[in-house]
């Protein structure tokens, strides 16, 4: 079970040859040993603590303010997180997710719902494969203030530790963009199906952004556009 297995993000349990860099007083930067993206890092908290975003969202802004060539993403504890018991983000190659490659088109059809000023706001993303919100900001203070308002407005089930969500953040010039994707379920029905109907896909931020990861080759080979949409 989760509580019985050694946490693979804690210092004492990581392989000795795992390269690590301390990026601030709270987080390390690790090379992801199982990369999905051409450049792929894991950013675990130095202290073992649950995967919770509310008080840690600012770390995403800080990271891309220093590394504009990367995007950073967050998987909620039941939204694709590989270690729901240890706070972590991931970062990787910027600009290759379908969400990003289509952003110029998507950004032309946003519906603003909360605005701090003409440039900083929360909007609804239309025309994407899944419903989503976007936070557009120019400063860390505005980014965090807008995220807190969105977080508090999102539904949270009684047995969940936070509203279910994935977040993908990147920087474009002076503009910080965070797409927040609300989630209804941890895994699709096809995950629990039997025989040929089964697809072992547990969507995280990358999947919800249009880059579906299939651990089994057989699932990849039988994936269609219609099935891909049903998995999200």
Roles of regions detected by a PLM:
Residues 1-59, 70, 82, 94-232:
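Active-site microenvironments that recognize anionic phosphate/pyrophosphate groups
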Residues 75-78, 92-94:
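An acidic- and aromatic-residue-enriched active-site/binding cleft used to recognize and process polar
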Residues 85:
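Histidine-centered nuclease catalytic patch
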